Amino acid sequence: MDPLGPAKPQWSCRCCLTTLLFQLLVAVCFFSYLRVSRDDPTVYPNGSRFPDSTGTPARSIPLILLWTWPFNKPTALPRCSEMLPGTADCNITADRKVYPQADAVIVHHREVMYNPSAQLPRSPRRQGQRWIWFSMESPSHCWQLKAMDGYFNLTMSYRSDSDIFTPYGWLEPWSGQPAHPPLNLSAKTELVAWAVSGWGPNSARVRYYQSLQAHLKVDVYGRSHKSLPQGTMMETLSRYKFYLAFENSLHPDYITEKLWRNALEAWAVPVVLGPSRSNYERFLPPDAFIHVDDFQSPKDLARYLQELDKDHARYLSYFGWRETLRPRSFSWALAFCKACWKLQEESRYQTRSITAWFT
């Protein structure tokens, strides 16, 4: 009796078939996994296809819209992480199509002040969008400020009490030894210069000049005066010992490129007419400039400048600060990056009265 003998081949075939099916199933699963993994488009914030091992969520990049170019002159948009080390980058654009998505809108006052109701953004603003009022002009040259009230959340200007402080210039310490050559006094062949564009006969600066020039020769450049071809300003002004850094209007902190660029970059001693001496001394050493308020009359100022012209040691004393400090100047790109930094450092949302603050 051998009833099991004929059944062995049938059992072996079933076992082999089962094994083959299992291996086929494993192979299909493996190749399916490879295909999905290869085709998966996910890229994580760390730049790889795999999540950051720290588990830190990605920080969104603020989108900043420049509603207008300042003075309608486009400028190169910076990488703020390079311009302000330690600052994360922002997406900065002048393309108004992004207005509905923008985290912030910078409005330069000069371009919207003529017709605010038509020139300010008119579409509804998204929740949390912050508007930044921006001006480098004094209140005397900013029209229709009341029309700005109730719209803006942050201020950006030359005023030191702005939410975003953007001065026309500042001093910073040298890192190491001063990199500039000593003053070449022999190249200072002329005495006093003044470059002026807006000539208002009744303005404080023109009235003071008219009294001063009765006692002292002043070379005046600009409209209706001596020609100053573009690109020759520094070369021309560097021949002078003194420069009249007279502001077009008198307001706190309104100390403009007339001092920071025209005078200091030309290595001319600035003779200033603007805010008080104490206001200037918030930004400059007291022996870095001459203030008209230090003299009882323009005649006394003229006499003092003539004395300095003959006394080289006293004249050179106005440059002592340059051994430890150097002047730096404003740029639009830097202003935009300061706004970028502020938006990421502070989430405060408020509505300010521009009129109450600025005037």
UniProtKB/Swiss-Prot annotation:
- Enzyme Commission number(s) of this protein: 2.4.1.152
Keyword Glycoprotein attached:
yes
Q: In which pathway does it act?
A: Protein modification; protein glycosylation
Chief place of localization: Golgi
Q: Name one GO molecular function term.
A: 4-galactosyl-N-acetylglucosaminide 3-alpha-L-fucosyltransferase activity
Query: Which key words tag this protein in UniProt?
Result: Glycoprotein, Glycosyltransferase, Golgi apparatus, Lipid metabolism, Membrane, Secreted, Signal-anchor, Transferase, Transmembrane, Transmembrane helix
Q: What is one Gene Ontology biological process annotated in the Swiss-Prot or TrEMBL record?
A: protein O-linked glycosylation
Q: Indicate the enzyme's highest-level EC class.
A: transferase
| Classification via InterPro entries | Glyco_tran_10_C, Glyco_tran_10_N, Glyco_trans_10, GT10-like_C_sf
Instruction: Specify where the region named determines site-specific fucosylation lies, as residue ranges.
Output: 73-112
Membrane topology, as annotated, equals:
Single-pass type II membrane protein
Source domain of life is Eukaryota
Q: Which residues lie on this side of the membrane: Lumenal?
A: 35-359
Its localization reads: Golgi apparatus, Golgi stack membrane; Golgi apparatus; Secreted
Q: What does this protein do?
A: Catalyzes the transfer of L-fucose, from a guanosine diphosphate-beta-L-fucose, to the N-acetyl glucosamine (GlcNAc) of a distal alpha2,3 sialylated lactosamine unit of a glycoprotein- or glycolipid-linked sialopolylactosamines chain or of a distal or internal lactosamine unit of a neutral glycoprotein- or glycolipid-linked polylactosamines chain through an alpha-1,3 glycosidic linkage and participates in surface expression of the sialyl Lewis X (sLe(x)), Lewis X (Le(x)) and non sialylated VIM2 determinants.
* Protein name per its UniProtKB record: 4-galactosyl-N-acetylglucosaminide 3-alpha-L-fucosyltransferase FUT6
